[in-house]
A protein has these predicted regions:
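Short alpha-helical DNA-recognition segment
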Residues: 21-36
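A short, Lys/Arg-rich alpha-helix, primarily the initiator
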Residues: 1-17
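Short C-terminal boundary/hinge segments that cap the last helix of small helical domains
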Residues: 59-62
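Residues in soluble alpha-helical coiled-coils and helical-bundle/repeat scaffolds
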Residues: 17, 31, 41-45
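Non-transmembrane "mature" sequence context
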Residues: 2-3, 29, 39
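Short, basic-rich loop-to-helix N-cap that marks the start of a DNA-contacting helix
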Residues: 38-55
Length: 62
């Protein structure tokens, strides 16, 4: 699962860079949780459902 979480974090980091978006803004808009990206960076592994939700948000807002 760790490799999946790392890949997911990489996707999020790429989105942040491509859209020049602050991590806190992304966290609030995508998950309604201000510390979401910080928690990912800290090593928390999201559930498959959470990753699906965030990927859908990125697709709709990309």
């Amino acid at each position: 699962m760790e490799l999946i979480a790392e890949k997911f974090l990489s996707e999020v980091e790429d989105y942040l860079e491509m859209h020049n978006m602050a991590p806190t803004r992304f966290s609030i808009e995508a998950m309604k949780a201000p510390a979401f990206v910080a928690r990912l960076r800290g090593g928390v592994s999201p559930t498959a459902r959470t990753m699906d939700r965030v990927r859908k948000w990125m697709e709709e807002n990309g």
